Amino acid sequence: RDQPRSRGLGDVYKRQQKVLVELKISEDPNKTGYPFKGAKNFISQLQEFKHIQIKGIMCVASKTEDQALVESEFEQMHTLYLELKEQYPDIDTLSMGMSQDYKLAVKHGSNTVRIGRAIFE
C-alpha cells in the first residue's frame, strides 16, 4: 500500500533540488532567514549536500519609509551575490524586492522580484 508513495519519494531524492537561500538582512524581528553575517560560511557548507543545488539568495528588506536603509540592505545583498556568483558558477539568482520596494531592488541588482498586491492596484 505504501510502496508507490515510497517509490515517489525515492525519485525526489534522486533529483537535485534547485533552491534559494533566504537571508535575514533586516533587523526586524518579524523577518526570517539565515543570518546575513554567516551566509558565506553557511552556503559553503550547503555545497556538500549533493541533492540540492544553490541557485541564489533571497531576502525581504525592512518595511520602512527609510529608503536609505532599504537601499543599504539591497546593496549588501547585491555585493554578497556577486561574491558568491564568482565562487559558485551555478548561482544566478538574486531575489529581492516586493510590491513596496521592487524598483529599488532592481536598481540594486535584483533579477527576481516577488510582486503580490501591486499587481491588483
Name each model feature, range by range.
Residues 1-13:
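Single conserved hydrophobic/aromatic residue that forms the stacking wall/gate
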Residues 25-119:
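Active-site loop/helix belt of alpha/beta enzymes
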